[in-house]
Amino acid sequence: MIATRNSSTHKPIETIANELERADKVLIGAGAGLSTADGFEYSGAWFQENFSDFAAAYGMTDAYTAGFYPFPDETEKWAYWSRYINHNRYLKEPGSVYQDLLTLVHNKDYFVLTTNVDHCFQRAHFDKQRLFYTQGDYGLWQCATPCHQATYDNHDQVVAMVAQQHDRHIPAELVPRCPRCGGQMTTNLRADDTCVQDPGWYAAAKRYQAFVSEAAQSRTLLLELGVGMNTPAIIKYPFWRMTYHNPRAHYATVSLDAVAPKQISERSTVVQADIASVLRLLAGA
């Protein structure tokens, strides 16, 4: 499959604006690049400012790789994770990127499929019934085994952990335990096949499939934002297939390394540019 690239920005943005206006349905695919464009940080000065103690102790350089670190005990692990969750799930508010995107689609029949777990779409006031976040949510905990298929809001516990941690440890009594089996809890993230899919997950999946079925018979804009090749089977490849099989579909992708396959190149718009700038231009069109 040969990929096509488009380095010019102005005309592709006009094309996306026209396709958006003409579309009966808009399917948004959002990856990590969208939140990065909105100012969410994971390394550099931000990491040093907020995790200097962990960086000094273990040589950590960024939040992503630090999340895989085998901490020696639960009290230290949850000191790190509570601080990280607090910053990226509760303290950092969605900014202009999400507001510009909502401005573009709030009067359209839209749906959002996202691999992001920062809850930004809901916090930016997108309609919850039009969201399917497939990979979990930093704001939810689950049994690590798991012994049952349920998730639990963690806001109050996370805030308590952050407030009471000292020397990279939380009090032992704050370590979360499964309310059923008493075992370890973990964040509801899709790292492997133990990720809990609760009734809310299945309800969202059903709404997404219903939207996709209707979109397959409609004039549809598939708008992909910040989606790389980390998990292409969730958003990118399905979007390519949907565009290929629906002659009334148009695929638009925006990221610094955006590409589209040759087979749908005549109905694709590729913008290799900063997502924030593109959405700002579109929202002001």
Where are these regions (language model features)?
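Conserved catalytic alpha/beta core of Sir2/sirtuin-type deacylases, generalized to analogous enzyme cores
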Residues: 1-285
